[in-house]
Amino acid sequence: MKKYLPLYEFLCASQKESIRFTFLEIENILESRLPQSAYIYREWWANGGHVQADSWLNAGYQVDSVDLVNHCIVFLKS
C-alpha cells in the first residue's frame, strides 16, 4: 500500500461523507501516475481484492461510482 499511502492519509483527514476526484487529482495526491489499467478497467476500482483498495477501505471509504469516460470517481464514507 506504500504507493497509495498518500491517498489513505488524505481520506483519513477528510470529514466529508462523499468525495469526488478526477483521476488527475488522485495522481496529484499520490505524486505518481495511476496505472493505465485504472483508466481502462472499472475492476481496478473494486472495493477489495487489490492493494489500492486498501487505501480507501482502511480510511473508511468505499467507491460509489467510477466514470471511465470522464476519468472521475466518487468515494462514500462507509
Regions found by a protein language model. Give the residues of each.
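Short glycine-/small-residue-rich flexible loop motifs, especially phosphate/cofactor-binding loops
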Residues: 8, 24, 53
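Generic cytosolic/nucleocytoplasmic N-terminal low-complexity/intrinsically disordered segments
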Residues: 1-2, 76
